[in-house]
Amino acid sequence: MSKQKEIVMSGLRPTGYLHLGNYFGAMRNYVKMQDEYECFFMVADWHSLTTHPDTKELKENVRRVFAENIACGLDPEKVAFYCQSPVYETAELYLYLNMMAYKGDREKTTTFKDKVRQHPENVNAGLLTYPVLQTADIILHRAKYVPVGKDQEQHLEMARTFANRFNHRYGDVFP
C-alpha cells in the first residue's frame, strides 16, 4: 500500500516579473517539493487586487506567472498549478472564515499596518481581510506545509486561529 503524500500549498501574487529573489526564495524549493509532496501552487489573483487593481494588467500577469514558473521547472503533470479566482469554494470559505476573524485580530497584522503606512490612500477591506482569504486558500486543501516568506508568518498563525475557531463553531472540519 502506497503512503499518501503530505500536502503543500503556496501562492504567488502576479504583481510583477519573476526575479532572482522569487527564484531562490520560492521557486527552486517548489520544484524540489513537487516530487515528494502533493503540491497545490496558486496564482493569487484575488490577493493581488489589494494593491494592484488594474484587471487588464492582472490577466496578462497571471498568464506570465504560469509561463515563468513552468519555465523554472514546475511540472503541471506533478502539481496542481491553478489560478485562485475560478475556485468558487475559496470565496465561500472566505465568507465563513470572516465570521471567525475579529476586527482587532486583523488590524494588528504587521503587513496591514505596513501597507496603511506606505499607502494611506489605498486602505481597503481586501488588505484588512487578506489573512482570512489566505486561510481559505490554505485550509481548502488541508495543507500540512505552507511555505511563505517571513512577512507572511503572522498570517499562518492567524490561519491556525481562524481554522480552530471554525472547527469549534461548526465541528472538526479542518486539520
Regions of interest found by a model, annotated:
Residues 2-136, 161:
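N-terminal Rossmann-like or analogous alpha/beta NTP/dinucleotide-binding catalytic cores
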Residues 113-175:
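Active-site cores that bind ATP or allylic diphosphates and position pyrophosphate for catalysis
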